[in-house]
Amino acid sequence: MAENEKVTYGGALPPSPSTADTEVAALARSMTNASRSSVYSPEKPDGTNPFLGTDDPRMDPLSGKFEPERWTKAILQLQSSDPEGYPHHTAAVSFSDLSVYGYGRPTDHQKTVGNYFLDIPGLARDILGRKGQRIDILRNFEGVIRESEMLVVLGRPGSGCTTLLKTIAGETHGFWITDNSHINYQGISFKRMHKQFRGEVIYNAENDVHFPNMTVGQTLRFAAEARTPRTRLPGVSRSQWAEHMKDVVMSIFGLTHTVNTKVGNDFVRGVSGGERKRVSIAEVALSGSPLQCWDNSTRGLDSATALEFVKSLRLSSKYAGATAVVAIYQASQAIYDLFDKVVVLYEGQQIYFGRADRAKQFFIDMGFECPPRQTTADFLTSLTNPGECLPRPGFEGRVPRTADEFAAAWRNSRDRQELLQEIERFNDEFPEDGEHLEKFKKARKLIQAKGSQSPYTLSTPMQIRLCLKRAWQRFMADTSNFLTSVIGNFILALIISSIFYNLPQNTLSFYSRGALLFFAILMNAFASSLEILQIYEQRPIVEKHKRMALYHPYADAIASVLCDLPGKVIASFAFNLVLYFMTNLRRTPGAFFTFYLFSLMCILVMSMIFRTIGATSKTISQAMAPSSVILLALVIFTGFTIPTRDMLGWSRWINYINPIGYAFESIMVNEFDGREYACGDFIPTGPGYTDVPATSRVCASAGAVFGSDVVEGAAYIATAYEYFPQHKWRNLGILFGFIAFFACTYLFATEFIAASKSKGEVLVFRRGHVPLKKEGASEDEEAGTGSTGTRTQEEPVDKDANIAGIQRQVATFHWEDVIYDIKIKGQPRRILDHVDGWVRPGTLTALMGASGAGKTTLLDTLANRVTMGVVEGKMQVDGHDRDSSFQRNTGYVQQQDLHLQTSTVREAMLFSARLRQPHTVPDAEKAAYVEEVIHLLEMQKYADAIVGVPGEGLNVEQRKRLTIGVELVAKPQLLLFLDEPTSGLDSQTAWSICTLLRKLANNGQAILCTIHQPSAMLFQSFDRLLLLQRGGQTVYFGDIGENSRTIIDYFEGQGADPCPHSANPAEWMLSVIGAAPGAVAKRDYYEAWRGSEAYRAVKEELRQMRENPKPISQESTDALRVYAAPFHVQLFHVTFRFYQQLYRTPSYIYSKIFLVAGSNLLIGFSFFNAHNTIQGLQNQMYSVFMGLTVFGNLVNQIMPHFVTQRSLYEVRERPSRAYSWVVFMLSNVLGELPWNTLAGVVLFFCWYYPVGMYRNAEVTHAVTERGGLMFLLIWQFMLFTSTFAHMLIAGVDSDVTGGNIASLLFSLTFLFCGVLAGPSGPNAFPRFWIFMYRLSPFTYLVEAMVSVGVANAPAFCSDIEVRHFEPPSGETCGQYLQQYMSVNDGSLANPNATADCQFCQQTTTNSFLTGIHSSYAHRWRNFGFLWVFILFNIGMAVFFYWLARVPKGSRVKKQK
C-alpha cells in the first residue's frame, strides 16, 4: 500500500507532549539499551511491532494474558524513533463565563383532540421566531482541563451535567451559548473545532444504538477501519491496523468472547445489556478522539466493569494525552479516586471546580460533615439536596443551603481565584489560532487519507466502500426480509397470474390486460415501501457516526442503494417472470425484457421517492399520513382508473409528474403496439345477425372500425388511454431523470436533515390543571422537572409526612424449602435451592446476591408470577396456603416503570384503586385513600401531571414513586414486593426511594426488596437480609444489625477476612461469598449456613409459624375472587381509560382523520361529479375501489397502539389481577368505536358528495335512504378495519409481523372482490377461486356501495363510447337493431337514419351493475353479511388472544 510508509498511533492513542513526553523519552532510552535477555520483564517491552504479531502473550490481545499498559508503551517506543513522522494532537479545553440557555416553558399542557388547534397561535409564534420564555440552564461556568487530565462531573439529574458535556462537545441542538462565553480548545476556537475538526471532540450518550444483526467484531472492526490513519507503523496495512485495534479494545473491555455474537437490541437476541454498553464504549475508544465527553456511560454496568472502564480512560489519558470529561451518577470511591479534577453542579450553577482530592476537604472546611462510609462522590452530590446534607456541629446556621448561596460561596473562595489564574495561564499558553492550531492541522493531515476533506479520516470513495462492506454484512446477517420478499412476491405472482391465467388473444381480454398490467406496475412500484421504515431504524446509528466523523451520511446512503440493488433485481425477476408468462402477455423475448426493464425502472424510481420521504421527515408519524395521500394520488393518476383524457383540469399536472404513469404507458404500448386482436364481441350479435355484412356490425371495443373483424392494439390504447407508441422510449429517459432527481434529494436529505431531537424535560399537565406558578429546577436534558427563568430551591424531603391512614398489614408471609427447576435446552437446571424466609409487617427485608443468583426469580416465585417450570416448597400466609386472591392482595413494584403515557399521576392511582380494592369499598373512600398515598409519596406538586414519556413528562424518580404508589393504593393486605427499585437511579434518588420504603415499613408495611450493590448508607436502611449465592442457594437470612454489625459478625465467625472500617459492608459481604467480580470465596457458604446455629433458629421459627396457624377470618366469597371488581365495572373503567387515552393522543386521531379526509377528498375530486357514461360509471366503481386502499394504513395505525396497551397489561396489570383479559380485548375494540364513527362521518362527506353519487339517488327519490345506507356501509368499513386489525395483532408479538399479515390478506380480499376480475363473464377468474370471491368481505362491501351509489339511474355514452356502423341496405337503424335491443340494453341516437347508426350500449346504470355482478336488491343482505364479518373479527380476536397469550391454567408444576 503506497500510503503506508509511516504510521501514527493515529486515532487510537497518540503520545502526550507534556508530562508523559519525559516519561516516554526516558522509557524509550531504557528500552533501546535493554538487553535481549530481559524481553519478558514487565517494565521493558522488546521493541517488536505488535501489529505484525508477537510471541509475548502480554502483547497479544487474543492471548488472555494481554497487558494494555505494556502494549501502549511498546507502541510509544516504536513511534519515538520518528517524532516528526508521528505527530500527535491533543485537545485540552478551558472555558470561562460559560452560560447556556434555552427557550420553552417549565410546564406544558397536554394536547388532546379538543385543544389541539388552540396551539396554532403558539405555533405561529414559533414560526415567527418568538421562542417563548428564556430558561437559563448553565450560569457562569469556569474551568480548565489539560491534556492527560480526567474530570468527573457530579450533580443530581436536572442539575445541568448533560448540558455541560454537550456544550463542551459542541452538540448544542435545542439550546444556545451566550455571546460572552469563551471556550478555548488549546488554541482552537469553538466554531473552528466543531466545523473543521468534528470527531476530535465527541460526546457519548448513555443510549446504546448499534445495528442489532451485526456481530460485536464487525461493529468494532468498522469503527476501527473508519478511523484508520494514513500513516501507520512500517509494514502495517490498513486491514492489519483495523483488525489489531479491534482486538485490543475488545480485550481491554472484556469483549473478546463476544466477537461472533450479535450486538442485538430489545427485539433481536444478542449480547447482554452490560456488554452492549461496553461495545458503545469500545466504539468511541476506537475513534481516538483527544477530547471525549462520557455521559452516564456506566449506567447498567456492575461496579467492577465500571471501574475497568474508567481505568481504560486513565490509561488513554496517561499515555496518549487524551482528555476525558465524565458524568457519573453512582461513583464508587475507587472510581472517584482515578479522576484528577471534579466539578459539582447545583441547579445549573457551579459550586466547585478543582482537584478531586481537595473537593471533600473544601466542603468540610465550609462546615459540612461527611458521614462514615459515605463515598466522596455521594457526599459531594448530597450537598445539593437540602434534606440530606449535614452541617457540622456549630455550623448549622452558617453553611449555604440554596444553589445561589453555594455558588456565592464558591465565587468568594480562594480555590476559585486559583482556578481563574490557571485558566489565564492556559489561555496565554494556547492563544486562539496560534502555533498549536498549525500542529493540530499537521497531525490531522498526516492521519487523513489522500483526498479526504476534514473532518473525515477516509476519502469519500473509501467511505462508500467501507459502508458497502457493512451493508453486505448486515444483509448476510439477516436474509429473512429478502427471502420473505422473494418468496412472497413469487406466491403473489402465482395468485395474480392464476386470476388472469392465459388471457385470450381477443378484444374480450382488453380490460383484463389493462387491469393486470396496472396491478403489476403497482406491485413493482410499492415493493420498496418498507424502505421508509429501514431509514428510521438506521438513522440514529448513522447520525451517531456522523457526529464521530466516521463517514458522510450520504456515503452510507449510496452504499445502501447499491447493496439493495441485486436483491431488488432478483425479487422483481421472481415476480415479473411468473406473472408475464402465465398470463399470456406478449410472448417474445424483446417484449418481456422491455416489460421487465420498465418494471425495474419503476421500482428504482419509487425506491428513491420512498427514501426521500423517509430522509426528509423527522419522525415516522410525520411521514405516514402525507405519504399515504401522495401514493394514492400516484395510483389514481397512473392513467388506468382515470384515463388521461378524463382527468379534470385541476389535477392533470399530477399525471405529468407521476413516474408510475410513464412506466404504465410504456408497458401498455409494449403489450398492444403492433398487434391485432380478434373481435370477441360484436354489435349487433345473436340470432338474426349471423349473416350480416361486415360493414353492418362493429366490434364492441374502443379503437374498433366498422367493417373490420380485428382491432389494432395501437388504436385501442390511443382511443381508450391516449397512449402512443412513440412515447415508449421517451418515457425511459424521463424515468432516468426521475431517478437522478430523487437520488439527489435523498442524498441531500440524508446529509443535512437530522431526526427530531427530544426537548429538555418538562412536566405536562392537563389543560386547566397547569399550576399557575411553577417552581422547579434545571431544564437539563437528562432529567428533572422543567425550570423557569428564575430558579427557586428544591424543598427538602419531608421525612415525617403523615402516614397514619395507610393500610397496615397484619399477616406474616413465610416460605420454606422453596425449589424452582426449569429445563434449558432440554437439560434440567435448578434456579432456586431450598430457600427459607419470612417477611413480617413493619420490616424492610433486602434480597441480595450475585448477578444470576435468582433474586428476581425468587421474587416472581413467591409472588406466584412464574409461568413455567417446577416449583416445590411451602409458601404460606400465617400458616395457610396462598389462595386465589393472593396476587390481588400483594403489591409488586417491577423494575421497569410501565405506565400509560396519557394518564395523570392521580388518574393512574385511581384506576388501580378502583379495580384492585374490594368492590364493596365506596368510590369516595378509594379516592380519599389515593389522596393520602399522594401525600405520603410527596407527589402533590405533580399529581395532575401527565405520566408522558421520558423527556416530556415525569422524570425517573417521579416515575418510580408512581410505580410504588400504584401498588400502595391497591391496599395490598399481605406484603409489597419490589424488584431493583434503585436500579439506574442516581445516588440521591436511590436514597430518597429507600427513605420512602423505610417510612412505609415503619407504618406496618411488610416489604421484600431486591437491591443490587447498595451503598453503605442505603444498606443500613434495611432490617433484614436474605443473601443468595449463584445457584439460588441461601448463605444468610437474618438481621443486618446496627452498622451492619450482626451480619459482619456472622461472616467473620465463618472465617471471612475482617471487614475494614471504611469498607461498604454490602460490597464486602458480596466479595466474601465470591459474588463480586474477580472475588473467590474461601469456603462454601451455603454449606456453612446449613450448618450454622442461625439456620436452625430460622427453621424452628418457620416450624412454629407452620404448626400454629392464625385462625382464618370468615371472608366473604368476594374476598376470595381472582378480580376485586365485577366484570361490568372492569369493562366500564378500562374502556373509559382507553377512550380517554385516544382522546389525549391527537396525533393518532388526527392522523386517522387526515388520512381518511385527505385520501377521500383526493378520490372525490379526482372523480368529481362523475357522469353515468360507461367510463363514468367505471370511475364511480373505481372511486369505491380506491377508497378501500386506506385500509392498510388504518390497520398499521391501530396495531402499534394495541401493542403498547398489551405490554402494559401483560407485564403489570394482568399479573396483579387488576382486570381480566376478556375485558382488555373488548375495551380495545369498544374504545375505538367513537373515533371510527367520527372517521366514518368524515369519509362519507369527503367522498360521497364530491363523486356525485347523491345525484343518482335524487333521480330515484331515495336520497335519504340511499345516503343513510351509504353512511352505514362506510361506518361498517371503518368498524371492519378496526376489528380486523385487532384480530390479526391479538396473538402476534410484533406490529410489523401483524402489518405484513394484514398486507397479504388485504391484497387477497382486494384482488377477489370482483372489480379487477369477476366470477363470470369475459373477465372471469378460474372457478377454483370462487371460494375466495365469496370469502372476501370486500365483495359484499363493494357490491353494496356501488349498487347503492349508482342503481336505477339513467345512463348514456360519451362521444368516443358511441359505436358507429352501417345498417343493411333498405333498413333504418331502428329496424335493423330492433331484435338486438329487445334482449340487450342500449339506445340509438338516430333510429330513423339509413346510414351511420350511432349506438350506445347502455340506457340505465343497472346494466353496468349486471356486468360487474352487483344488484341493488342485495344491499340489505350485504349489510347483514358485513355485520357477520365484524362480529367474526371480534370473536376471533378474543380467541386468538386466549390461544396465544393467556396462560392456560398454569404451566407451573407444583410439588409438595
Swiss-Prot record:
Residues given in the record as ATP binding sites: 849-856
Domain ABC transporter: 118-372, 813-1056
Membrane topology, record value: Multi-pass membrane protein
Sample GO molecular function, one term: ABC-type transporter activity
Residue stretches spanning the membrane: 481-501, 515-535, 561-581, 590-610, 623-643, 734-754, 1148-1168, 1184-1204, 1233-1253, 1269-1289, 1301-1321, 1337-1357, 1423-1443
UniProt-listed Gene3D superfamilies: P-loop containing nucleotide triphosphate hydrolases
Biased composition (Polar residues): 30-40
GO cellular component: membrane
Keywords for the protein's UniProt record, in alphabetical order: ATP-binding, Membrane, Nucleotide-binding, Transmembrane, Transmembrane helix, Transport
Stretches the record annotates as Disordered: 1-65, 775-799
PROSITE patterns: ABC_TRANSPORTER_1 (PS00211), ABC_TRANSPORTER_2 (PS50893)
Family: Belongs to the ABC transporter superfamily. ABCG family. PDR (TC 3.A.1.205) subfamily.
Function, in words: ABC-type transporter; part of the gene cluster that mediates the biosynthesis of erinacines, cyathane-xylosides that show unique biological activities, including leishmanicidal activity, stimulating activity for nerve growth-factor synthesis, and agonistic activity toward the kappa opioid receptor.
Descriptive protein name: ABC-type transporter eriD
Gene source species: Hericium erinaceus
Encoding gene (name): eriD
